[in-house]
């Protein structure tokens, strides 16, 4: 496949992803328990506890499952039973915003639109352009 054909194919999937993502987010915001922030981030509380909340300068230990709208799993630390350690300020914008809402021990689902994730470019071969990302996150600890 030539570079031009690849570029045109990518543009097609980008447009398809944008439409599918927009349709998904419009329907998802109507579901019971889903909250939409002014930024466009949508989230649902799966399990809430009364712990402390992290701040943007913290490092966190989290369990996470990230998947695309088509169900393709990008990462699943629950299955691997190996939580991730990350710096909050290094996360994509939508993930960071959602994580700062959480309390230690809680579990949330984030529905992150492309403009709060990797946008038009995507991320390498794992995340296509204009992809909505669905994260299932448990905040284990932070410091």
Model-derived features: positions:
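Cross-family detector of peptidyl-prolyl cis-trans isomerase
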Residues: 1-143
